[in-house]
């Protein structure tokens, strides 16, 4: 379920352009994934519980131009992230392409504000300074002021390009053990 932005094995309704998570387990991916000879999809159950899976794959057998980019995705986890260490979202990407988006399943281990980590994009040989440097995670995701609305609460939202669609909590702001799912797509960048 990580591929369809359902971190923590808990549903979080989401209405975006490439991914939709709908009521009662509807998880839909609309990413274009061209292939020239064959394609393989693998599902892995990381629990000891049996799962019932229903799926539909829509494809067409057409010629794919030589300059058509492939779809690549990376998954990795740091639990917990070392203090003051940068969390790398995409590593060692080479060649021509477009970065299309980020999904973060974020767990909080302290009673402090967790979203001030700036998002940095080191591109095209950047070393010391990134081409893009943001002001905080909540700003990168499309929110502001710690996603607080109404006062004293986090606010779920889901838009075509960004959202904080999962809030798994003890109640209130800045509480340890809260978990969040959030995304940002760069489809028009």
Language-model region placement:
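Beta-strand-centric surfaces of beta-sandwich/beta-rich domains
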Residues: 1-189
């Amino acid at each position: 379920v990580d591929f369809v932005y359902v971190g923590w094995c808990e549903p979080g309704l989401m209405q975006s352009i490439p991914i939709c998570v709908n009521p009662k387990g509807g998880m839909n991916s609309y990413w274009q994934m061209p292939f020239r000879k064959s394609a393989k999809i693998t599902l892995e159950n990381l629990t000891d519980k049996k799962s019932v899976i229903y799926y539909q794959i829509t494809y067409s057998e057409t010629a794919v131009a030589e300059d058509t980019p492939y779809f690549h995705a990376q998954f990795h986890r740091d639990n917990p992230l070392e203090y003051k260490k940068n969390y790398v979202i995409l590593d060692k990407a080479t060649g021509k392409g477009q970065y299309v988006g980020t999904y973060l399943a974020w767990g909080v281990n302290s009673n402090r504000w967790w979203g001030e980590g700036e998002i940095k994009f080191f591109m095209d040989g950047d070393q010391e300074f990134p081409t893009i440097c943001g002001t905080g995670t909540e700003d990168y995701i499309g929110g502001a002021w710690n996603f607080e609305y109404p006062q004293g609460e986090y606010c779920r939202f889901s838009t075509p390009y960004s959202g904080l669609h999962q809030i798994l909590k003890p109640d209130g702001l800045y509480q340890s053990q809260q978990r969040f799912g959030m995304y940002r797509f760069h489809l028009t960048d």
